[in-house]
Amino acid sequence: MEQNGENHLKDPLLQADGGGSGASPAGASPRKERKTRKVMFNVRGISCASCAVSIETVVAGLKGVESVSVSPLQGQAVVQYRPEEADARTIKEAIEGLNFEVDELQEQEIAVCRLQIKGMACTSCSESVERALQMVPGVKKAAVGLALEEAKVHFDPNITSRDLIIEAIEDAGFGADLISSGDDVNKVHLKLEGVSSPEDIKLIQSRLESVEGVNNVECDTAGQTIIVAYDPDVTGPRLLIQCIQDAAQPPKYFNASLYSPPKQREAERHHEIRNYRNQFLWSCLFSVPVFMFSMVLPMISPFGDWLFYKVCNNMTIGMLLRWLLCSPVQFIIGWRFYVGAYHALKRGYSNMDVLVALGTNAAYFYSVYIVLKALTSESFEGQDFFETSAMLISFILLGKYLEVVAKGKTSDALSKLTELAPETACLLTLDKDGNAISETEISTQLLQRNDVIKIVPGEKVPVDGVVIKGQSHVNESMITGEARPIAKKPGDKVIGGTVNDNGCIIVKVTHVGSETALSQIVQLVEAAQLARAPVQKLADRISRFFVPTVVVAAFLTWLGWFVAGQFDIYPREWIPKAMDSFELALQFGISVLVVACPCALGLATPTAVMVATGKGASQGVLIKGGNALEKAHKVKAIIFDKTGTLTVGKPSVVQTKVFSKIPLLELCDLAAGAEANSEHPLSKAIVEYTKKLREQYGSHSDHIMESKDFEVHPGAGVSANVEGKLVLVGNKRLMQEFEVPISSEVEGHMSETEELARTCVLVAIDRTICGALSVSDPLKPEAGRAISYLSSMGISSIMVTGDNWATAKSIAKEVGIGTVFAEIDPVGKAEKIKDLQMKGLTVAMVGDGINDSPALAAADVGLAIGAGTDVAIEAADIVLMRSSLEDVITAIDLSRKTLSRIRLNYVWALGYNVLGMPVAAGVLFPFTGIRLPPWLAGACMAASSVSVVCSSLLLQLYKKPLHVEEVAAGPKNDPDLV
């Protein structure tokens, strides 16, 4: 669909000059070298900033060096260079030439790839893949997720390659397909048109590699497709398409269109499901007749007489038919178990395939022995067990089929997230004055940074951006979990994947591709599902000796029953008809082999973590892996920051006081000039108040005075040189640091302000306090209820703030927090956390990310609240998309529910094996006459894995705690503040 525009692939420059859509590809400057490397040096002897500057100056002057950064505090130098023109040794010698000692260099060129792993069934399998990857030279780090069936590998591309990594996995007996290469960078996949030879593709590749902003180009000559990794700050997919078009020389014509390869994970999952289903159905085609010929028809006349008819000596028609029908099941359909067992034993470990292969082979080859013995003897009579082998394989395949179907549902939440973004967007073409002159519907993947798009009511927001025109309400529940639509006006951010409710808005694109909030959420959840929870170590330890123990137990079971039968320790009537003591013992031994299930143990943790992280993401709670999920359930104390955490984080100046003859506007101008470079909410409040004050005085200028020598004093305030004056803006501690006298009048005003639960910000000019600004930041409406609910969960709440004691105590009293630490700087917050940890408490820290990084990192569990679109917060273990304290409760409650589910899974998996193996070994047989036939034992084994996965799937029914939902449904402030 197109309106007043041309085909967007033929003419990608849809914005007119000055419209802000991006630069022409013709104007993109080609680069001399595409590839760069980064190296880090540990440099000793750096004592000051001037040392760092001297190193940077010398190294930057070397040929081929693109950038250099020296950290005096860490004693490190990071240099990015072009390997064709420079090398690490030359750079090291240059630094040593300045009389600095340089340690051995550490190359930082690490590549990343994600692989789909096929054939993993239990923890032993995932450990085998991980060991195989770690043994590959050049592999730095490898993480394998059993439930996700993926691996993420960090490797040195100078030593190994993706092909060698895949080959190592295949040598270990598993399949591997490349999902993606690169560490989640922006890429576009294009299908080439008009290409007639490999030379054409090479020409296109060279042209693309010369474009500024292109990081890598991968070509598939056979499929005529190309993958381009690019920097969205410099270029974009439409510019790349035009570059391809411009590469053609008449009469040739090149074009490119977006290519969407099949979603590999879903395709592999569906293929695996179809494969197991087909194998099960084929096995039933043979196993059911074997079962009928063995168990049912011999009891029905005249079928019984026919089946017992002797063909040669004592070999009957029934024996021959069962042998012929069972063999395809054993060696064709069951071949996968032989392959899996071979590769496992080859690598020095054992898995479920080993148990299945041993059990079915024992039944099959003993049955073959019986048939051959009957064929060659006129007096021998024996009973074959072909139905055991055939039915066992069929039931195991049925269990695997049900298991992969259930496992596929564990990633439903993640799949729904990936499908939120719309396929198309309405791109506007603007004139020089910013007015829309045409609009064109294009693929969302073709959007570039700074594009301007139109979103009408009911449409999904395609990518992250900022509203530049129009007003509306946007439903963000699918991303943040916020139940109510959020009001949006010019200047507000919108998130890709959310739904525009009732107004038409014009949005400027700010983030595309892998940089969007939705993509970051998906990446974070995928990484979390790859990470192992500490509780998984229990299954890992058990899996190492599980199968050998089962094999020994099965042998001892057979030996015990066989010896007991030979020496008549039990009555002969215990032995079923048509069996002898050896055959009865063999049945018990095979049952023990196949009833044991290591898969259920291996799936207990990863499936629960996978469902929980996906469920949390759908509610705006992003949990960074099983470690954070497990630690959160142990939390006994939570430390809250005040500003932006307990309060709404939108402080405003509500009162001013001048202590000198300086005009109020001049005082505020100087304070705003000093605060303009700070990101703290109080600083923004002062700057905003100054702008409004100017309007009251008749000035409409937004200009803020420039400052020099700006410095942040953590927990105290800021200092700067504004208009030649030393301006200090902060609390009492800042004034004391600069030895500024504080009069009794100032002290009195501070006390009055703090009694009203306001923050008193002092402004000193040239070491004289000239005024004070009273800043109020209202409490979040749910704060009191959230603190009360945490208390009911057995969690104590503590407030640690850099604000004054009076304000802190007033806020704490209002929300119900009993323990308060005030006037604490960011480092002090981390120290308070360590003090609590020394007392044996598991401590969580909740902060808004501003000045809270040390505390978030020091806490056992760091929760960054109100992340919004900024979900890549490194210091936090759990990222909360909204600013609501109810999500803190949701995170901890979800953690507790998940750990309870994992424990239940372990109880079931361990209990099943602990109880199932003795029953299979025949402990009930002497008392009740009940025994577990091998085929039924196999069915029980298959059911155990399915039951564990289904148990984990129950986490999809998780709902927020009742009281918290009541808070969410209650009245709220301005939606912009919540």
From Swiss-Prot:
Catalytic activity annotation: Cu(+)(in) + ATP + H2O = Cu(+)(out) + ADP + phosphate + H(+)
Compositionally biased region (Basic and acidic residues): 1-11
Ranges where the HMA domain occurs: 37-103, 111-177, 186-252
Residues covered by region (Disordered): 1-35
Enzyme class (EC, first level): translocase
Statement: the UniProt record of this protein carries the keyword Mitochondrion: no
Main function: Copper (Cu) transporter that mediates Cu transport in root vacuoles. Involved in Cu detoxification by sequestrating Cu into root vacuoles and limiting translocation of Cu from the roots to the shoots, and accumulation in grains.
Induction per the UniProt record: Induced by copper in roots, but not in shoots.
GO molecular function, one term: P-type monovalent copper transporter activity
EC number, as in UniProt: 7.2.2.8
Mutant phenotype after disruption: Reduced plant height and biomass. Reduced fertility. Increased levels of copper in grain, leaf sheath and internodes.
Family: Belongs to the cation transport ATPase (P-type) (TC 3.A.3) family. Type IB subfamily.
Database matches in CDD domains: HMA, P-type_ATPase_Cu-like
Topology versus the membrane: Multi-pass membrane protein
Keywords annotated in UniProt: ATP-binding, Copper, Ion transport, Membrane, Metal-binding, Nucleotide-binding, Repeat, Translocase, Transmembrane, Transmembrane helix, Transport, Vacuole
Record SUPFAM superfamilies: Calcium ATPase, transduction domain A (SSF81653), Calcium ATPase, transmembrane domain M (SSF81665), HAD-like (SSF56784), HMA, heavy metal-associated domain (SSF55008)
Residue sites binding Cu(+) 1 per the record: C48, C51
GO biological process terms on file: detoxification of copper ion; transmembrane transport
Signal peptide annotation: none
Tissue: Highly expressed in roots. Expressed in vascular tissues of the stele, mainly in pericycle cells.
Protein name: Copper-transporting ATPase HMA4
Coiled coil: none
TM segment ranges: 280-300, 315-335, 352-372, 385-405, 545-565, 584-604, 907-927, 935-955
GO (cellular component) term, any one: plasma membrane
